[in-house]
């Protein structure tokens, strides 16, 4: 029989526990016994036990002191205290010493077995169950993908994939990871076809208010209409999997509801984030704001420098002329700390709008800085880094303040990103935009099947800046290279996180609507 773990059982009346020991041994556990804390401490130093079962009332060294000695030798050993004492001070002391379970005698063999099983076999049971459930879901997803006809159905399918990705962060079975990666890639191919076939209709259909320009109106405006205050947070370039990875933590602070929106094409800040703050499509935006047109024409870096003005105009168009608004863009750590220290000063406003660039900076810098390449080698590393940032940065302090305030909170992103692997050669003149996953300019061309070519931008509510003006969008995990600099840029871009094109990760973006738990 396969040994499931080596347990040391410490009890001065161990002779009375022989039936329990035999029961555990029959279940596959190896049991070593000790009748006092001193002997147990020696045995613990000579053996690597997987679990300790411990009584409190023993002659000489009592259970709590024995626990401290055991933990001083190996801090991570799990311990179950099994004792007759029901004193609350003992329970508190055991908990403070990071005991794993507390059982009160008398206990049946099955009770002890279940406690041991939960600690020693939990990971294997979860892994086996996860594997079995995914293989069943794999078949369902493969069948569903052929019948998807709406964005809602794509969103539900994408959520399934993302939830499996997060569950697999705890798995060691790399083959299962690879199956999921292949399935996600196939779903992206089908999603790209859906977008090519339906995007033009989606942007022209007023009955589909799920695109970037409708985000504020759909999710923040209702709170203002009801006389409430709103903190509207856009975390640039944050992906769905990253939102879901922080969801449990957010639930510890807020009541959370999740919705979604579809990022505009190109999935780039200058298009999608401007659309969120202005409530307008890109072609409408440059007509209303000529200076935005000038920024596009000159390929300026500050293509989002008018967001505060756009948001104020949108709020007024929606009928809230009297609302006091504070807009704040955070692009560096020190700026975030300054905002966090002043957050209470802004709570008198009706609307706090916050733009955070940290996740976008991670995406772009991870291909340039060796330390970040180590931290973010893949999507899982990216998720863990973002989750750690949320829990340990100035942003966590802001969230805690908001959870205790009278603000409704909306968190979303303008677009996501995707890890790119396949280069596409593209021909363009020197005036073309320099995006890695999208390009716009005069007479752009590529014959690659992983490119969506838009020769009629007006039908897609995209701006036109001259004759023969068109757009190229990379699909799936592709990226653009110019032939004359292909090798130099391929080394930099291969396996990096980019955005601007068509993929589930870039286009399907969560919207989290949150209220403090105390409200």
Which functions belong to the PLM regions below?
Residues 13, 22-23, 57, 92, ...:
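Feature captures the catalytic ectodomains and active-site-proximal regions of enzymes
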Residues 14-32:
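Two-component/phosphorelay signaling modules centered on CheY-like receiver
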Residues 35-39, 62-65:
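Acidic catalytic/metal-coordinating carboxylates
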Residues 42, 64-75:
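Short amphipathic alpha-helix used as the core "switch/output" element in two-component signaling
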Residues 48-53:
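Active-site beta3 strand of CheY-like receiver
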Residues 55, 83:
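Active-site residues of response regulator receiver
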Residues 65, 86-101:
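Alpha4 helix (beta4-alpha4-beta5 surface) of REC/receiver domains from two-component response regulators
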Residues 105:
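A Lys-centered signature of the CheY-like receiver
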